[in-house]
Amino acid sequence: MVENQVFRIITWNAQTGTIEEKYRHLEKYHPDVVVFQEVARPKLTSDHCIWSGDNPRKGVAVITSGDYSALPAPLQPDTPDYFLPVEIEGPISLHLMAVWTHKRHNYVESVKDIVAKYRDFLKHPSTIVAGDFNSNTIWDNLHRNYCHSMMVADFDKEFNLVSSYHAKNGINHGEERDPTIFWLRNADKGYHIDYCFVPKDSSIRNVVIGNYEDWKTLSDHRPLMVDLVFSSS
């Protein structure tokens, strides 16, 4: 591993469209890995592109660039199509769980099953869980079986994972200043529902959420970009 290697990951709910069409809007940021939600199934997949979903027009995808490749991790029985476990190989190797929670799986409540099914996978020392969770502490009362705050606590206690945005900015869940979605593309209906959970002891160099004006014509979500610094072991 290269000393002080910077790893850049972007998660973005692209609100439909092809991977090729949507990815070109992110290329200028030179991401090592992109986690997409709501993108169409590509004609071909490779070790740089993995897609999963039960609707060919809307799925979750992991795209790598440069020296990085993505390998599908073994699936546990009854894994929802919109959770995609991937092994990232390259200058930095890690486990990645791509997430897009769905209404028909009770949104954040479906994460409880993923935590149970993929406990060993998520316990890898270099693990990232990223995507559109459709959840926030402000809606905990709507999910009494398993709410956002429970998920955050589980990630912290069991897997040593924290939200990069909250850790970098010293902000509590539910007190976010930067929305990641503008419901119906309305600037007055902003919510923070997209997250990138990273190891608590990792060095978070930067966390950036796209500007509303720059992205409003492309999606109701804004990309969340995270830079992590990895030192050689």
Predicted regions and their residues:
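Metal-dependent phosphoesterases centered on the DNase I-like endonuclease/exonuclease/phosphatase
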Residues: 112-193
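Active-site environment of divalent metal-dependent phosphoester hydrolases
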Residues: 16-21, 39-44, 104-105, 136-138, ...
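Structured beta-strand-rich core segments of catalytic domains in phosphoester-bond hydrolases
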Residues: 37-106
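Conserved beta strand-loop-helix elements of the APE1-like EEP
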Residues: 55-71, 88-89, 175, 182-205, ...
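Surface polyanion/phosphate-binding segment centered on an Asp-His-Pro turn
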Residues: 217-233
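Surface-exposed cleft-lining segments at the edges of enzyme active sites
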Residues: 97-111, 137-142
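N-terminal, active-site-proximal structural segment of metallo-dependent hydrolase catalytic domains
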Residues: 1-47, 57-60, 231-233
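Active-site metal-binding loops of divalent metal-dependent hydrolases
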Residues: 14, 39, 101, 133, ...
